Amino acid sequence: MESANASTSATTIDQLCKTFNLSMHTLQINCVFCKNALTTAEIYSYAYKHLKVLFRGGYPYAACACCLEFHGKINQYRHFDYAGYATTVEEETKQDILDVLIRCYLCHKPLCEVEKVKHILTKARFIKLNCTWKGRCLHCWTTCMEDMLP
């Protein structure tokens, strides 16, 4: 799948599939971190999260679910700037909270309006990691809360 044009033009799973005339179901792509092949479910999840494809040595790479979560945690510990409520995010970005691209700090999915509103209603803070605002998606929110239960 090596191609000079692909490495410069295809930045998403969808674009990669179109460039090489493949379906997501038949695409085989490795994790940039652990080098294992992504499962079909991980490929669909990666595309759903609007994450970018990386090229190394002319070959495309993505990230498996395990490595995404692992590196999300590492990023949280290494690059934590500060935490703030929705008003802080709005003041800093000069945008309405619903218009700001905020990703989950664990799975990296873009937060939808419902997830942002949940942060506001529960008075949960967004966190700024490496100069980028992050939050928790509903899936990871539930997972985090389960860890707190006896």
Curated annotation (Swiss-Prot):
Position of the signal peptide: none
Record's keyword annotation contains Transcription regulation: yes
Zn finger limits (unnamed): 31-67, 104-140
Keyword match DNA-binding: yes
Gene Ontology annotations for the cellular component aspect, listed alphabetically: host cell cytoplasm; host cell nucleus
GO molecular function list: DNA binding; zinc ion binding
GO BP terms: DNA-templated transcription; regulation of DNA-templated transcription; symbiont-mediated perturbation of host apoptosis; symbiont-mediated perturbation of host ubiquitin-like protein modification; symbiont-mediated suppression of host innate immune response; symbiont-mediated suppression of host type I interferon-mediated signaling pathway
SUPFAM superfamilies referenced in this protein's UniProt entry, alphabetically: E6 C-terminal domain-like (SSF161229)
Compartment(s) of residence: Host cytoplasm; Host nucleus
Keywords assigned: Activator, DNA-binding, Early protein, Host cytoplasm, Host nucleus, Host-virus interaction, Inhibition of host innate immune response by virus, Metal-binding, Modulation of host cell apoptosis by virus, Transcription, Transcription regulation, Viral immunoevasion, Zinc, Zinc-finger
Matching InterPro entries: E6, E6_sf
Other comments on record: Belongs to the low risk human alphapapillomavirus family. The cancer-causing human papillomavirus E6 protein has a unique carboxy terminal PDZ domain containing substrate but low risk E6s do not possess this domain.
Family: Belongs to the papillomaviridae E6 protein family.
HAMAP family: HPV_E6 (MF_04006)
Subunit comment: Forms homodimers. Interacts with ubiquitin-protein ligase UBE3A/E6-AP; this interaction stimulates UBE3A ubiquitin activity. Interacts with host TP53 and EP300; this interaction inhibits TP53 activity. Interacts with human zyxin.
Function in brief: Plays a major role in the induction and maintenance of cellular transformation. E6 associates with host UBE3A/E6-AP ubiquitin-protein ligase and modulates its activity. Sequesters tumor suppressor TP53 in the host cytoplasm and modulates its activity by interacting with host EP300 that results in the reduction of TP53 acetylation and activation. In turn, apoptosis induced by DNA damage is inhibited. E6 also protects host keratinocytes from apoptosis by mediating the degradation of host BAK1. May also inhibit host immune response.
Protein name in the entry: Protein E6
Organism: Human papillomavirus type 6b
